[in-house]
A protein has these predicted regions:
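Single conserved hydrophobic/aromatic residue that forms the stacking wall/gate
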Residues: 1-5, 9-12
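Conserved acidic/glycine
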Residues: 6, 20, 31-34
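Active-site phosphate/oxyanion-binding loops
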Residues: 28-150, 154-159, 165-170
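Cysteine-centered nucleophilic/redox motifs
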Residues: 11-19
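Active-site catalytic microenvironments for nucleophilic, acid-base chemistry
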Residues: 19-20, 95
Protein backbone atom coordinates (compact mmCIF):
# COMPACT_ATOMS: atom_id res chain seq x y z
CA UNK A 1 0.00 0.00 0.00
CA UNK A 2 1.08 3.60 -0.43
CA UNK A 3 1.80 6.32 2.06
CA UNK A 4 -1.20 7.73 3.87
CA UNK A 5 -2.05 10.42 6.40
CA UNK A 6 0.44 10.91 9.18
CA UNK A 7 3.14 8.99 7.32
CA UNK A 8 3.02 11.44 4.41
CA UNK A 9 2.93 14.38 6.78
CA UNK A 10 6.02 13.39 8.76
CA UNK A 11 7.97 12.63 5.58
CA UNK A 12 7.06 16.05 4.18
CA UNK A 13 8.07 17.77 7.45
CA UNK A 14 11.34 15.88 7.51
CA UNK A 15 12.19 16.79 3.90
CA UNK A 16 11.30 20.42 4.55
CA UNK A 17 13.53 20.63 7.62
CA UNK A 18 16.40 18.96 5.78
CA UNK A 19 16.01 21.44 2.91
CA UNK A 20 16.28 24.22 5.52
CA UNK A 21 19.58 22.75 6.71
CA UNK A 22 18.27 21.10 9.88
CA UNK A 23 19.69 17.67 10.72
CA UNK A 24 16.34 15.98 11.16
CA UNK A 25 15.68 12.26 11.25
CA UNK A 26 12.46 10.38 10.70
CA UNK A 27 11.68 7.82 13.40
CA UNK A 28 8.69 5.77 12.21
CA UNK A 29 6.48 5.04 15.22
CA UNK A 30 5.77 1.55 13.93
CA UNK A 31 9.41 0.68 14.65
CA UNK A 32 9.07 1.24 18.41
CA UNK A 33 5.47 1.91 19.52
CA UNK A 34 3.65 -1.26 20.60
CA UNK A 35 0.72 -2.28 22.74
CA UNK A 36 0.37 -5.50 24.70
CA UNK A 37 -2.41 -8.10 24.47
CA UNK A 38 -4.65 -5.83 26.57
CA UNK A 39 -4.17 -2.95 24.08
CA UNK A 40 -2.12 -1.03 26.65
CA UNK A 41 1.22 0.53 25.69
CA UNK A 42 4.23 -1.67 26.42
CA UNK A 43 6.66 0.82 28.02
CA UNK A 44 9.55 -1.66 28.29
CA UNK A 45 9.34 -2.52 24.58
CA UNK A 46 8.90 1.16 23.64
CA UNK A 47 11.96 2.23 25.63
CA UNK A 48 14.17 -0.55 24.27
CA UNK A 49 13.19 -0.14 20.61
CA UNK A 50 13.20 3.67 20.72
CA UNK A 51 16.70 3.69 22.23
CA UNK A 52 17.84 1.42 19.40
CA UNK A 53 16.37 3.84 16.83
CA UNK A 54 17.98 6.86 18.49
CA UNK A 55 21.39 5.18 18.59
CA UNK A 56 21.25 4.75 14.81
CA UNK A 57 21.21 8.55 14.37
CA UNK A 58 23.56 10.15 16.92
CA UNK A 59 24.07 13.43 15.02
CA UNK A 60 20.42 14.35 14.62
CA UNK A 61 19.19 17.72 15.90
CA UNK A 62 15.48 16.93 15.58
CA UNK A 63 13.60 13.64 15.57
CA UNK A 64 10.25 13.47 13.80
CA UNK A 65 7.68 10.77 14.46
CA UNK A 66 3.94 10.11 14.43
CA UNK A 67 1.51 10.16 17.29
CA UNK A 68 -1.12 7.53 18.19
CA UNK A 69 -0.07 4.91 15.60
CA UNK A 70 1.53 1.69 16.85
CA UNK A 71 1.70 -2.04 16.39
CA UNK A 72 -0.33 -4.33 18.58
CA UNK A 73 0.97 -7.47 20.31
CA UNK A 74 0.41 -9.42 17.08
CA UNK A 75 2.44 -7.03 14.92
CA UNK A 76 -0.60 -5.50 13.23
CA UNK A 77 -0.88 -1.76 12.67
CA UNK A 78 -3.13 -0.26 15.33
CA UNK A 79 -3.83 2.96 17.22
CA UNK A 80 -3.45 3.84 20.86
CA UNK A 81 -6.94 3.58 22.29
CA UNK A 82 -6.99 6.78 24.32
CA UNK A 83 -5.20 10.10 24.29
CA UNK A 84 -3.66 9.72 20.83
CA UNK A 85 -0.73 11.95 20.02
CA UNK A 86 -0.51 13.48 23.51
CA UNK A 87 -0.27 10.00 25.00
CA UNK A 88 2.48 9.16 22.49
CA UNK A 89 4.42 12.28 23.54
CA UNK A 90 4.18 11.26 27.19
CA UNK A 91 5.23 7.67 26.46
CA UNK A 92 8.22 8.87 24.42
CA UNK A 93 9.16 11.42 27.06
CA UNK A 94 9.15 8.72 29.72
CA UNK A 95 11.09 6.30 27.49
CA UNK A 96 13.94 8.76 26.91
CA UNK A 97 13.88 10.30 30.40
CA UNK A 98 13.08 13.74 29.00
CA UNK A 99 13.52 16.77 31.24
CA UNK A 100 10.05 17.99 30.16
CA UNK A 101 7.15 16.75 28.05
CA UNK A 102 5.54 19.44 25.91
CA UNK A 103 1.97 19.16 24.66
CA UNK A 104 1.16 21.78 22.02
CA UNK A 105 -2.49 22.78 21.69
CA UNK A 106 -4.62 25.89 21.10
CA UNK A 107 -4.66 27.05 24.74
CA UNK A 108 -1.87 28.41 26.94
CA UNK A 109 -1.71 25.86 29.75
CA UNK A 110 -4.43 24.45 31.98
CA UNK A 111 -7.08 27.03 32.95
CA UNK A 112 -9.65 27.27 35.73
CA UNK A 113 -12.33 27.08 32.98
CA UNK A 114 -12.31 26.34 29.26
CA UNK A 115 -11.21 29.65 27.65
CA UNK A 116 -12.85 28.56 24.40
CA UNK A 117 -16.20 28.79 26.21
CA UNK A 118 -15.77 31.03 29.27
CA UNK A 119 -14.46 34.62 29.13
CA UNK A 120 -11.76 35.79 31.54
CA UNK A 121 -10.31 32.48 32.64
CA UNK A 122 -7.02 32.27 34.48
CA UNK A 123 -4.22 29.81 33.78
CA UNK A 124 -3.29 27.39 36.53
CA UNK A 125 0.51 27.42 36.34
CA UNK A 126 1.37 24.43 38.53
CA UNK A 127 -0.56 21.23 39.21
CA UNK A 128 0.42 17.91 40.71
CA UNK A 129 0.06 14.93 38.38
CA UNK A 130 -3.03 13.72 40.25
CA UNK A 131 -4.72 17.14 39.98
CA UNK A 132 -4.05 17.37 36.24
CA UNK A 133 -5.31 13.83 35.67
CA UNK A 134 -8.44 14.52 37.71
CA UNK A 135 -9.20 17.73 35.80
CA UNK A 136 -8.73 15.86 32.53
CA UNK A 137 -10.90 12.98 33.74
CA UNK A 138 -13.71 15.35 34.68
CA UNK A 139 -13.75 17.11 31.34
CA UNK A 140 -10.78 19.44 30.83
CA UNK A 141 -10.57 18.91 27.07
CA UNK A 142 -7.00 20.16 26.78
CA UNK A 143 -5.52 16.91 28.06
CA UNK A 144 -6.59 13.27 28.14
CA UNK A 145 -6.19 11.61 31.57
CA UNK A 146 -4.01 8.79 30.18
CA UNK A 147 -1.39 11.30 29.01
CA UNK A 148 -0.41 12.04 32.58
CA UNK A 149 0.42 8.47 33.66
CA UNK A 150 3.76 7.90 31.85
CA UNK A 151 4.97 11.36 32.91
CA UNK A 152 3.89 10.72 36.50
CA UNK A 153 5.67 7.36 36.70
CA UNK A 154 8.86 8.91 35.28
CA UNK A 155 8.41 12.10 37.35
CA UNK A 156 8.67 14.33 34.26
CA UNK A 157 6.83 17.68 34.22
CA UNK A 158 4.26 18.22 31.46
CA UNK A 159 3.95 21.69 29.96
CA UNK A 160 0.89 22.65 27.91
CA UNK A 161 1.93 25.17 25.25
CA UNK A 162 -0.07 27.25 22.79
CA UNK A 163 0.59 26.87 19.06
CA UNK A 164 -1.10 30.25 18.48
CA UNK A 165 1.18 31.97 21.03
CA UNK A 166 4.45 30.00 21.15
CA UNK A 167 6.14 32.52 23.45
CA UNK A 168 3.52 32.08 26.19
CA UNK A 169 4.85 30.22 29.25
CA UNK A 170 2.21 27.49 29.26
Amino acid sequence: YGLVGSEMCIRDRNYYLQECGVKSILLPALEYMRTDKNAEPDPVYIKEKLQMQLELHPGAEIYITQGYICRNAYGEIDNLQRGGSDYTASLIGAAINASEIQIWTDIDGMHNNDPRIVDKTAPVRHLHFEEAAELAYFGAKILHPTCIQPAKYANIPVRLLNTMDPTAPG
